[in-house]
Structures are given as C-alpha cells and as structure tokens.
Amino acid sequence: AEYAMRNYDKAIMYEPLSESLAQLRELFLYRQMVVRHRCSFQVRRGEKKLTMEKSPIKTMISQSGRHIVSELNKEVEKIDKRIAELIKSDEELTEVFTIVTSVPGIGTQNAVCLMVYTDNFRRFNYDSRKIACYYGLAPFGKDSGTSVHSDPHVHYMANRQIKAMLTQAALAAVKFNP
C-alpha cells in the first residue's frame, strides 16, 4: 500500500479497448482462424490428389473439400466486408487506417493487424524503440566487458505475426514500388 501511495503519480491507468476496436479485434482473429482452416483443407486436398488412385471415394472427398474451401472463401469475403464497414463507421479508426495504408506495401490486413495489436497505436505512447521491440524488428546483442559478445538477435517473445506481416509488406513495397 505504501509503494502504491508513493508511486501513484507514475501509475498508468488501464483503459479498455473502445467498442469498435474490440469488435475489429474479434473479426480479425476470426478471419485468421478461417484462413488457417482454409489453408489446411487446401493442403489436405492436394495431398489426397497425389496419394489416392481414381475411385468414387476420392471423387467424393475431392468434391467435399472443394465445397468446404469455397464456403471458407465466402466466409473470408464476408469478414473482409464487415471489417471495412466497421472501419468506415468509426471516425478514429478511419483516420488511422487511411494513414497506415498510405505507406507503400501496407494493405488492409497489415493495417488492421497493426491497429488491433497496438490498441490503435496508443499502446506504446508513440515510442519508436518500444514499438520496434514489440514488432520484433529491433535486434539486440549482449556485451559484457571484452570477452562476452553475442550476435544481435530478436527476442523470442516478439510478436511474430506482426513481424511476418511487416516483412511481407516490405518485400511487396520493394517489388512493386522501387
């Protein structure tokens, strides 16, 4: 209690996500799950085509898999439309989304991912070092005196999903916007 009283002025009060950002987060995570399932069905269909000989069972499995993949594609499209509607309905989300997508290589999914995981860029108080560490973009080495040195590497607790999305965005920007 004494510690809390002494450091009360330094305390950062918790602020829950806004309603629209919480909904955006749920939609984004649901979309990721659907895309993962779609990918797994596509891989399984490809494996079945290679391993099974022509038979009525193979035909049935292939048709069923194709139907499931098409339904999952429709679901992803519905989610994408809902995400776009949600962003347009909130003024703050629209403003941030417009700014983020103005960066070459950053698309809708990259922008939504960044907005969701950084609480619409308010989570780190605009500190670039903290943001780079969280994204997994800032490698750090260990040095101690003259004998202990390690190569710089990214911490294992960095957000790998954001790092992967930003890497893909950078590759796309280099490829299409030299």
Regions found by a protein language model. Give the residues of each.
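Long, charge-rich intrinsically disordered scaffolds of nucleic-acid metabolism proteins
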Residues: 1-99
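Phosphate-backbone recognition surface of nucleic-acid-processing proteins
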Residues: 102, 108, 112-178
